[in-house]
UniProtKB/Swiss-Prot annotation:
Disulfide bonds join C44-C59, C51-C68, C58-C86, C70-C84. InterPro entries: Spider_toxin_CSTX_knottin, Spider_toxin_CSTX_Knottin_CS. Pfam families: Toxin_35. Expressed by the venom gland. The lineage of its organism: Eukaryota, Metazoa, Ecdysozoa, Arthropoda, Chelicerata. GO terms for molecular function: toxin activity. GO terms for cellular component: extracellular region. The presence of a 'disulfide through disulfide knot' structurally defines this protein as a knottin. The keyword Disulfide bond applies. Keywords: Disulfide bond, Knottin, Secreted, Signal, Toxin. This is U1-lycotoxin-Ls1b. It is found in: Secreted.
Length: 107
């Protein structure tokens, strides 16, 4: 009976040690992820700025991430080029308006 208790205690100790190592690894990975998110936030493209070269790099607005909206521009020479900027799509503007109105009514 004593041998069984020693083996169980040893197993519990090993399991708790391995799980604490896993938690430490998870915390380190989470910290790296948070640092990467902060770096991305610093490098994101603000609203109304050009995003032609990086169409997925727009920053987040109050509720939604800005979308890269593109238009075709025709120069005086007749040459067509695509120009893009970060902005809020109409359906996101409507949702923000409804949420803002709801906050004013319901506090």
């Amino acid at each position: 009976m004593m041998k069984v208790l020693v083996v169980v205690a040893l197993l519990v100790t090993l399991i708790s040690y391995s799980s604490s190592e896993g938690i430490d690894d998870l915390e380190a990975d989470e910290l790296l992820s948070l640092m990467a998110d902060e770096q991305t936030r610093k490098e994101c493209i603000p609203k109304h700025h050009e995003c032609t070269s990086n169409k997925h790099g727009c920053c987040r607005g109050n509720f939604f991430k800005y979308k890269c909206q593109c238009t075709t521009v025709v120069t005086q020479d007749g040459e067509q080029t695509e120009r893009c900027f970060c902005g809020t799509p109409p359906h996101h503007k409507a949702a923000e308006l409804v949420v803002g109105f709801g906050k004013k009514i319901f506090g």
